[in-house]
């Protein structure tokens, strides 16, 4: 259960994986685009997971319709603003929204830096309107290769002060982290924090690579860490957080069942692990589902669920002073 005495966070939440089905329909009509259906309920199976996908790449294809309708920078601003509203409506006090500007720009050849600016504007407007603390994480979409990621990084760096951290996401097997060392060197030079999707499709070696070569302070998903006891010890000793996404890992066939999910193992090993959504609109879930249904099904005790909630704030890419402000806000 969610502890109302603690700030509720979601630190692994994709902005471009949380585009409302109604918004996809609206923007499709606005830009005269051909969609797989022209009514909301008929469209939903095309943009939302209705059954377990065979692998991560198949899961990611469900996200494509959301970005396919981003025909203007104003459309990008709209989905960013709606993401803040959705986070506030979910009861979150703090969220880190991550997005890939190249992925959002690609279909309609929008300027990457312009997409970043539009997203920032939408987020800032949403934070003013909905009284929630949101930070932005830029994603390099490894699936599109090193050169595309350079364009993406340049676009993000053009607005570096509004970006908190850099992430690497996409096809983990086809594009290992070592290809992006220079990208992450530049990110660290800019003062950004680092989180990396690793150990989701690939094994523990991908997590080691993210830590040693890219400077990862947190790992997205990281389910394969349980296969390497030395890695588990290292994560616990160095407070490298695991951003767990329970339902997502089932839907991508990364984990066979919630009962087999390693989150409880992480917590019992002393690893800093938290509960997050991933792509709420695509998954058809929200943060409450993860706490009330998924976490108990994954074998977490009420005390472990509370610990995971507390870990979310501990892992957040904000200062201790900012964390205390969030705690004080709950108490008041």
UniProtKB/Swiss-Prot annotation:
Cysteines paired by S-S bonds: none
Organism lineage: Bacteria, Pseudomonadati, Pseudomonadota, Gammaproteobacteria, Enterobacterales
Pfam family, one: A_deaminase
Protein name as annotated: Adenosine deaminase
Any one GO biological process: nucleotide metabolic process
Record site: Important for catalytic activity: 221
Cofactor comment text: Binds 1 zinc ion per subunit.
Active-site residues from the entry: 200 (proton donor)
Gene3D superfamilies: Metal-dependent hydrolases
Binding annotation for Zn(2+): 12, 14, 197, 278
Needed cofactors: Zn(2+)
Sites where the protein binds substrate: 14, 16, 170, 279
Catalyzed reactions per annotation: adenosine + H2O + H(+) = inosine + NH4(+); 2'-deoxyadenosine + H2O + H(+) = 2'-deoxyinosine + NH4(+)
Keywords: Hydrolase, Metal-binding, Nucleotide metabolism, Zinc
PANTHER family: ADENOSINE DEAMINASE
Enzyme Commission numbers on file: 3.5.4.4
MF annotations from Gene Ontology: 2'-deoxyadenosine deaminase activity; adenosine deaminase activity; zinc ion binding
Single GO cellular component term: cytosol
Family, per entry: Belongs to the metallo-dependent hydrolases superfamily. Adenosine and AMP deaminases family. Adenosine deaminase subfamily.
